[in-house]
Amino acid sequence: MFFFGDASTRPQIKFLCLFIYFIYMEEIFEKSQLENEQPTSKEPEPALKPVDVMSIKNAAQYVNQKLSAKGYFSNKPNKLRQLLLLSLDSSQLIPENAENFEISEKVYENDRNVMNIIYSLLNSAEISKQFKETALKKMADKDAEIELLKNEVEKLNKKVDEKERNIQSLQLDKIKSDLQAKHYQAMLNNVNAKNKEQERTFRLYAEEVKRELRRNEMEVDRLESRLSNMNKRRASPRDDAEAEPKRQKFDNDRFLSLVKENSHLQHDLNKLVGVLLRLQKFLKSFGQLNSNSKVPSTFIPTDSELLAIDHHNFDLQKYDLILFDLLKPLNGDSIDDTFKFKKNNQTDKDQEIASLRNRLSEMEQNYERVLATMEQWKTYRKQK
């Protein structure tokens, strides 16, 4: 089985066959030499048995059939078509001296040896042929197996190539995913930066509104104090009973004007309360998860919200503390008196400041009308 492995061992097989053939021929030659070297007996040779002649004849017939089948003889008419032996075909080999020729034991022995050698060679050739056919068959089987293995290797190589393509595709997908992750991270950073900017803008805006409200409150307190002081300075006691109805009339007129002014002040107070409530509501939701942190366009309440506000139950100090607690976490940076707002926030702030200034101007005008009324009343009394 070792010598039929692949095509590289074919020369070894041929060499082995030739080596066996030469060993076999050498054994036959040594055997014949030993027989020739044996001492000859002086006794007369025994007569040839008919059985020996028949065996030589049968062997010659078998050998001639084999040689003829293998094409060793010529097909020409004047050529021999079989192997002639001196012991059997002496008349054909030496026809001129056939009558005087005597076939000896040596002739028969020689013919027998020739037949044995040819028979052995034919058998060796048959064995070599079978050996060669077997070897070729095994080689063909090995070649088929090699071809099958090659096909299998080719299939495996295709699978490996496909796996490599899949790996490359996965690597490309990973690179794309990394790029998308970086893009989304950049977007997240931008959103966080915008949120911080909006938070800072809102914080500044809230502080500005808070200061503006406090200025308005201080201005209202100042005007109320001024009005109260003027009333105290201008008020004078009257002993005359006749003047009491007129003074009562003046007090009623002044009371009506003050009631009207008080109504305006209550309306303004309700607006301020509504602004504070809206601001408080927005600050509570600002910065919470899944909440709309967009700064509203205005904090001025609607008419329906004003009707629902009861200023008598409004505690300014309480809401001031609440707003202070809500704005305290946002007060991370120092705030100057100069603010920079975006265009829309600046517009809203300007509108609210303008509205507050208009209300303040109306209050001042009302105050002036009150003073004018008091002067008219004073002049009227002097005329009386």
Swiss-Prot record:
Region (Disordered): 224-247
Keyword terms: Autophagy, Coiled coil, Membrane, Protein transport, Transport
InterPro entries on file: Afadin/alpha-actinin-bd
Location within or outside the cell: Preautophagosomal structure membrane
GO CC terms in record: phagophore assembly site membrane
Predominant subcellular localization, coarse grouping: membrane
Coiled-coil residue windows: 132-236, 342-379
Basic and acidic residues: bias regions: 236-247
Protein topology in the membrane: Peripheral membrane protein
Any one of the GO BP annotations: protein transport
Domain of life: Eukaryota
Role according to the record: Specifically required for selective degradation of peroxisomes via macropexophagy.
Family statement: Belongs to the ADIP family.
Protein name: Autophagy-related protein 25
The species this protein was found in: Pichia angusta
